[in-house]
Amino acid sequence: MEDLDALLSDLETTTSHMPRSGAPKERPAEPLTPPPSYGHQPQTGSGESSGASGDKDHLYSTVCKPRSPKPAAPAAPPFSSSSGVLGTGLCELDRLLQELNATQFNITDEIMSQFPSSKVASGEQKEDQSEDKKRPSLPSSPSPGLPKASATSATLELDRLMASLSDFRVQNHLPASGPTQPPVVSSTNEGSPSPPEPTGKGSLDTMLGLLQSDLSRRGVPTQAKGLCGSCNKPIAGQVVTALGRAWHPEHFVCGGCSTALGGSSFFEKDGAPFCPECYFERFSPRCGFCNQPIRHKMVTALGTHWHPEHFCCVSCGEPFGDEGFHEREGRPYCRRDFLQLFAPRCQGCQGPILDNYISALSALWHPDCFVCRECFAPFSGGSFFEHEGRPLCENHFHARRGSLCATCGLPVTGRCVSALGRRFHPDHFTCTFCLRPLTKGSFQERAGKPYCQPCFLKLFG
């Protein structure tokens, strides 16, 4: 602050010698943008009195003079000749100095903490020497032809001055010999030691803590929701709950093809999830017809599994109805085709026997087909006669064998008379004219008819 007081006194002296005609017309002061706010931290040491006139391009560098004893100032003209210019400049300078006094400490300490102390000290010494060389060459008063900067320009120059102050600090009291000591920065609580710098682990924990607190403020849950069933690590954020466990969404995948199963259906086998394709391909039963996995409805028959549309007759390809199916050598058949292909045949019609049948003459017969093969009359009493492997009634059987009575046409079952190439009942072998029995065994034959001897002589003499 001592340098600033000297700066103010030099400015008053210089502005008092400015001619009134050379002073430019003052512009009205513009509202200043308030500087950024910083927390005030008092400092000790000589670094506060930095060389405010170190920048050769600074607006107020013209008032800086060497530190040699100042000669006696000449008699100043009456104050009334430059009272307008001086009053406006002093008011503007007072406002700038107030802003500088409020912000220079915190800005300097904050920026200087980013540079090593050795480099800062050496830079300060070099800058101090360069400033001492430059100060005598500067003019003692500003050029009368240059216009006076406005309040906004002064604020910008003040910001530039503050930026230069943040680059170096001049130490007024340095030891005569020995290494350069860094400036001592004091905090508000001077009795407490400065906190140690956080280690890498502490910084990481701090960052994680800040991240979790920020996520919590945004409504994102950060608490662990259990351990992942795949990687066994804590879960934070999105979670998939399935099979009685919690999973990371990227770890809940198919056990076969590793496809993510977060929003799709899946199947479980031995505690592991599988997508439908892998599950059916690996664990579904195979169809006995097409050998493909069965996904939905299934028919179990003949010791294997079938698609419903594939369990059909192997002969006609028709699906089985309510009547069921028949099996032959492990292959299913419908009733019609099975009976047509494998059912026993009727000896009479050669058709398949579906229901009742009669077994006779070493063959199977439909009940309606087992009749006399000559007259097709059913057998009364269940008895029949067989001739050359064919069933016959009694009359047709004796007719085939020639054992019918030539007179009455009935079968001859007992005693018989064989004559004229035919058989007769004994009572039915008589004379054709007188009808007497021909018991004596002698008869005459005429046109295939038997006659007794008297009738034959009488008729045919």
From Swiss-Prot:
PTM annotation: Phosphorylated by gonadotropin-releasing hormone-activated SRC.
Tissues expressing this chain: Expressed in platelets, smooth muscle and prostate stromal cells (at protein level).
Chain intervals for the UniProt region annotation (Disordered): 1-87, 116-152, 172-205
Chief place where the protein resides: other
Segments for region (Transcription activation): 1-200
Residue stretches in coiled coil: none
Protein name (database record): Transforming growth factor beta-1-induced transcript 1 protein
